[in-house]
Amino acid sequence: MLHLARKAFWPAPIPFPVLHVDTGHNFPELLAYRDRTVEELGLRLVVARVQDYIDDGRLRERTDGTRNPLQTIPLLDAIEEGGFDGVFGGGRRDEEKARAKERIVSLRDEFGQWDPRNQRPELWNLLNPRHRPGEHVRVFPLSNWTELDVWRYIEREDIALPGLYYAHEREVFLRDGMWLA
């Protein structure tokens, strides 16, 4: 996503801050990569930490240990505090059922909620980001990309990634002479 934003605004710098909702379950190598990239590109980084919300009693640690579902409140607070009326995300429709029905330009109401009845049609490449005061949009430019599209883009653009991305073990299977994940 960051690479696409750089290309979109080149030769000018990216004109908006980069937002990271930190679950506290990130690998140090990834945080170092994030910080190094932000510094190299001269970006302003906004970090909303789930742990801060747990420490303040605004969120409770889950019994299953995952913090992904806890990201919503820190995200909504960061959007409100930053005065953002739009947020870019890297979600893809092939990742899970909930994202499969997400629009590329997804309207959120004044409570940050997604209501399928309020979503606008996406006809051809016509997208409508209009919203009322208090609402915001989330924009998912990679919605129609597959994981393979992402990896091909990374290869084509020669984007450097932390080694951890290549070290993750995944379940794969062979079908019609191709390895699939």
Language-model features: locations:
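Nucleotide-activated chemistry modules centered on ATP-dependent adenylation/adenylyltransferase
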Residues: 1-181
